[in-house]
């Protein structure tokens, strides 16, 4: 059956109705899931297996039957481990139907159908009794309900319900316990992901400073955690103000509460500085003795950094304090971890929690609009003074006496730069209510509410009256649009430029004047694992899961790229960067598709995992801003990526199909096409010897 789905097209800006298979959302969820990454997590799998063996042995040693409840079974892997370890029976709970169906097949393929019952329900809907899903309560509870924040996938309510209704009192639990750790740091780089810094502009009248509104200064920020690969943040980018502090633990073998709570930890600052950011991670102990431990600690907090396990389904957390606060070396303070049933947040106190009335009991929520409009990388981009200087320098070359400027980008400071650098009149278009309110506040804080005109409209709806009857001589964009996911989605600027063509004077300047799509073949250190089939996992055949993911990729994304922030995922270039397509913003969007095909020579040995694609914006003939590679490639091909943008990754067949040989091909062929009607870019990259 087909269904019609309405979607906003991020490139053209139009609402489209697409005919989709009724299961398209299932396929999308499977294709973009972390199942493959989890199966490749050797450390996780081994530790779970060890913990399950130990738990089954403890129950058997007491002369009891080992009855296992596995919540969130996924592939059924942990249940199969339990049966192999000697469990008498397993009840495997999986709420996602396609996954539950796959688990049934995997369990059958491995010969465990007589010992494992897969139940397609949410665990809170599972019943116990003669006519229930379970005939009696289980005495071993096995779960993998954790995310980077530990509790973000509803682990606490699920455990709370399981202990009340599904498992015996004092049951064995794998994992047995989790502990959340935190470290207070000062970091200008990370703080720039949360607050707007003053922006400095050199003008003919001297230095002008764009200041943030007081509402942004006071705002506690976005309520959500920022999860990143913290191992890719150099230790030179932050100063530790505290030791690593164990903030709180959860014993999964006993009754768990999902009620809101706070946990205070006193510490003595290691250095004086501005307390801004809390870095956090967790570990899980698989056994009561704490001998079998799986940790998410970054390299500097590891006892054996050389044995660091890469994983993407669990990373580390960056939390921002509501406000930065000075701490003094040697003067004790308290760090407080707060949590409700799904979220964690932090506050800093002078004394213990019961003596301080200013504890943030309620989760911080943005009230300034900026954190709703700008994500963390966007804050970093706006705070990048070198980038601002490049735009300012380009503006100086195109601004003329009497310039009438129109700025088209979401929540951009370019309109302020244009004003300070001498534009006679500046208009800026803000199509969303959030960006309109935010920019009003920024203009007011800088006493520019009468100097820069904000128009709350989509560009295609602009009228001559909106522009006070004037013709635009400079059309300006970064471009940045909040709805963009892939690098080329910001080509919406080109569509906006086309729709305002009637308002441009003859010979009007457009900045950027053009854009180019670049591609490069790379070998990833680790990212390839998220799309690589597993085959065998700890002795269990999971090919069915591999096939399921491949089918979903073929259904939806086999010819698509996916966005990844590659500064977090090291890779080596195997080819030189190659310009694939160019888009001339001086001209309207063409009517006919733009096609390019060719090949990329592999200049370095390695495994061709994928093609990375990014956009470069040519502000002027002499100034280009890259959303991808930031520096020329080093001899070994190590890449330095723009940290404020996500790049697009097209995984090659060598990654998703192990039958394709990794070595041998000397080039990669490509065919890329831009479709003006939809704004889509379709592509195919193939190793030279897989063309037939």
Curated annotation (Swiss-Prot):
Keywords carried by this UniProt record: Chromatin regulator, Cytoplasm, Differentiation, Methylation, Methyltransferase, Nucleus, Repeat, S-adenosyl-L-methionine, Transcription, Transcription regulation, Transferase
Further comment: Confers resistance or sensitivity to DNA-damaging agents. Down-regulation confers increased sensitivity to the Top1 inhibitor camptothecin (CPT).
GO MF annotation, one: protein-arginine omega-N symmetric methyltransferase activity
Residue numbers bearing the Omega-N-methylarginine modification: 32
Residue ranges occupied by any SAM-dependent MTase PRMT-type domain in the UniProt entry: 14-345, 358-684
Classification via PANTHER family: PROTEIN ARGININE N-METHYLTRANSFERASE, PROTEIN ARGININE N-METHYLTRANSFERASE 7
UniProt family annotation: Belongs to the class I-like SAM-binding methyltransferase superfamily. Protein arginine N-methyltransferase family. PRMT7 subfamily.
Subunit and interaction comment: Interacts with CTCFL, PRMT5 and SNRPD3. Homodimer and heterodimer.
Entries under InterPro entries matching the protein: Arg_MeTrfase, MeTrfase_PRMT7, PRMT_dom, SAM-dependent_MTases_sf
Protein name: Protein arginine N-methyltransferase 7
Protein task: Arginine methyltransferase that can both catalyze the formation of omega-N monomethylarginine (MMA) and symmetrical dimethylarginine (sDMA), with a preference for the formation of MMA. Specifically mediates the symmetrical dimethylation of arginine residues in the small nuclear ribonucleoproteins Sm D1 (SNRPD1) and Sm D3 (SNRPD3); such methylation being required for the assembly and biogenesis of snRNP core particles. Specifically mediates the symmetric dimethylation of histone H4 'Arg-3' to form H4R3me2s.
Enzyme class: transferase
Catalytic activities: L-arginyl-[protein] + S-adenosyl-L-methionine = N(omega)-methyl-L-arginyl-[protein] + S-adenosyl-L-homocysteine + H(+)
GO cellular component: cytosol; nucleus
GO biological process: genomic imprinting; peptidyl-arginine methylation; spliceosomal snRNP assembly
Catalytic residues, chain numbering: 144, 153
EC number, UniProt record: 2.1.1.321
